[in-house]
Amino acid sequence: VARAKRFLLTFLLGTLSAFGPLSMDMYLPALPDLQANLHTSQSLAQLSITACLLGLAIGQVFVGPISDRFGRRWPLLIGVGFYALTSFVIVGVTQISTLIVLRFIQGLGGSAGQVLSRSIARDQFSGKSLARFMAILMSINGVFPIIAPLFGGLVIRFTNWQGIFMILGIIGVILVLCVLFFLKETLPKAKRSRSTGHAFKEMGELVLDGGFMKYALGQGFVMGALFVYIAGSSFVFQQIYHLSPQMFSFIYAINGISLVLGSNIVGRLVTNLSEERILRVGILFGVSVTGLLSLSLILGTNMYVLMIGLLLMVFGIGIVNTTATSLAMNAEGDKAGGASALLGLSMNAIGGLATPLVGLFGSHSQVPMVLLMFTAEVIGFLIYTGFTKRLA
């Protein structure tokens, strides 16, 4: 029974943490269709991704401290319910401006799933057991980038981009029911913040904590590289290389497997190696891969070199995401909601600001996308190493 309960908790938290991938990856094969249907530009279509990412980021700033004060369960129910409702409303949208606003609101609701899945995990685990649980959680999270674009490509084949939001709404309703009937409160009243104001104050203290921020900002920029890839890959493979939505979805799914492998390997390595060392290697690996890929594309290579480079980059991101999250949450166990909120804010805000740059720097070449990924990886590396040396 205990094993079954743990499996259910793991799967539920993994799905809740995947609101970002669910909201982006299922939607990616539909971007060209959406652009044509709403008579808009590539950059405005990509802005709908940015809006959702910013909603995910800003929402976490409020949900995290509120959950430290009032517990995890009710903020989670309200947020996921709001996500489901907004998804259904988006189905009737006819203008890109309305879609962008609603995507922001959808992100606000989905932020509860992202921030509270990490907080609930920290309520239940600590130390290396948290690292192992996070590796499992991130592996489940990573399954969605595999399934979602394939499913999205299939939906586009039979319906249109609105059908994807109908499905997202249904998923939201199912998760509300799962939380309502299967998830108990994990933060006892004795461990909650004295007031909401005190919870926000604690989050402010985290911003000034270099030991925490080196993980939050370092991870944020590395994940920024992933969001640049998410925003640009649909147009690169479908419009530059003229692949079908289904073939693009297949390539994207293969990279999703690479993300799962990167996350999963951490759970095995952490038994013999320190998490700090694993994180350092993961960041350096990402910088090296994107640097070499940028150079090769500038010199002129084919689609297969790009595919291999992206596969390796995403593997490194899986390593960084898992270890940085575990290290940051371990360091701030008594402020789990605020710590999780800042991690989410960093990832989604940086990703949200980076994604429109892909369209602005040109949609007729893959080079801007890869150079932006390399830049994000380098900044993440510099922030992590800079903070580490300062704190030594």
What is each of the regions a protein language model found here?
Residues I58-S97:
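Conserved MFS/SLC helix-loop-helix module at the cytosolic interface between two early adjacent transmembrane helices
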